[in-house]
Amino acid sequence: SDCQVSNIQVMQNFDRSRYTGRWYAVAKKDPVGLFLLDNVVAQFSVDGSGKVTATAQGRVIILNNWEMCANMFGTFEDTPDPAKFKMRYWGAAAYLQSGNDDHWVIDTDYDNYAIHYSCREVDLDGTCLDGYSFIFSRHPTGLRPEDQKIVTDKKKELCFLGKYRRVSHTGFCESS
């Protein structure tokens, strides 16, 4: 891979209805700035007109030391590529971030794993200057061994290999 954002391959023939439901983030590559720390669970839905929406929650620390469960919302705008969306997102509370990000589905088998990618800022040389990525699993316990290799190959293609951190699931957001 030459690390050019414009050359990144996304999921072919992406099926949004099979992508719906609950996904547990098992690893993430952080962007610059405030971001969900762990206990990240995303839920994707498709309405009657085919529009994609999502909710996500995860643990954050704000004001330096206040730990809380953040509830985030997103609406997805279609692009000519079915696996590439423009996502408008906001938090349930005013001090949580809001904005617009790309939301690309790089690969998924719909039943076990999914790889998400978002570049917030492309550098002058065409590589990603500020971006983030989630590795999702349908299972809170993590990826199956047979999915690990696929995911590692995709991390390389995204030029994010070695930049991911494990996302733990401790039940923090279920209790709060």
UniProtKB/Swiss-Prot annotation:
Can you say where in the cell this protein is located? Secreted
Q: Which InterPro entries match?
A: Calycin, Lipocalin_ApoD, Lipocalin_CS, Lipocln_cytosolic_FA-bd_dom, Retinol-bd/Purpurin
What does the record give under GO molecular function? retinol binding; retinol transmembrane transporter activity
**Residues found modified as N-acetylserine:** S1
Could you tell me the keywords of this UniProt record? Acetylation, Disulfide bond, Retinol-binding, Secreted, Transport
GO CC terms, sorted: extracellular space; yolk
Q: Where does substrate bind?
A: Q97
Q: Which Pfam families match?
A: Lipocalin
Against SUPFAM superfamilies, the record matches this protein to:
Lipocalins (SSF50814)
Q: Which domain of life is it from?
A: Eukaryota
Q: List the disulfide bonds.
A: C3-C159, C69-C173, C119-C128
Q: What does this protein do?
A: RBP delivers retinol from the liver stores to the peripheral tissues. In plasma, the RBP-retinol complex interacts with transthyretin, this prevents its loss by filtration through the kidney glomeruli.
User: What's the family?
Assistant: Belongs to the calycin superfamily. Lipocalin family.
Q: What is this protein called?
A: Retinol-binding protein 4-B
Q: Which organism is it from?
A: Oncorhynchus mykiss
